[in-house]
Amino acid sequence: MRFKATAAPAVTLLRKLVFAIGAGFALNCCADTFVRDDIITDPDPAQFNICHDQGCASLTWVRLSAEQWQRVRSVFATPAEAPPEEREQIRSAIALLETVVGPMTGTSSDLGGTWPGFGLPGQMDCIDESINTTTYLRMLQKYGLLRWHGVVDRATRWSLFSWPHTTAVIEERSSRRQWAVDSWFLDNGERPFVLPLETWRDGWKPPQKEAAGGGGVPGAVIK
């Protein structure tokens, strides 16, 4: 089930670009500032929403069936015995949620990165991806599926020579070490990269063969 709210009847490519840039700069001003005030920040499988079309220009309300949510819960059926194992479960759960939600929101064909599918319907930039991944993580946390990690504010990295980039973040409960959960580099439904946040902040990018469209096994956890 879905209900779509679009920021404007016809959002031009220029407006999308300006919106995405502006959203990135806004994230540097305060903790986890979302780009719209109608984003559900306490999501539930029965009611949450998904950003798409760059900079959350479009927002679609989604409801999972009991069967769909049970599929997600089953990823955690065997409790993780250590944080690394749970990070693998998180990767699988995020990929599954993207696969289930894609047909409801028109985002099944989302391509990794911003530019390969820029301007096409249902495409996502890092603002969309980081908000959506945070939404999924919050639902997992809300239903007690995360034993070793908690969900924290998103993070943005800045560079003089490239665009700002934003990711979802989890924190290991025992060590307080934070991990980036970054699905932006990958096509819809692929398991996201999970890596130490400090490594991600240093400008980390995946090897070309692991990035979207490059073949290989995408989304490996970086130790």
What are these regions (language model features)?
Residues 202-223:
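Low-complexity, Gly/Ser/Thr/Pro-rich intrinsically disordered linker/tail segments
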Residues 2-18:
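Bacterial N-terminal signal peptides that target proteins for export
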Residues 33-54:
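Short N-terminal segments immediately surrounding and downstream of signal-peptide cleavage
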Residues 52-59, 64-82, 110-119:
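Acidic/histidine-rich, surface-exposed loop or edge segments in extracytoplasmic proteins
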Residues 89-149:
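Mid-length scaffold segments of soluble, non-membrane domains
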Residues 138-200:
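Hydrophobic/aromatic-rich core segments of domains that either
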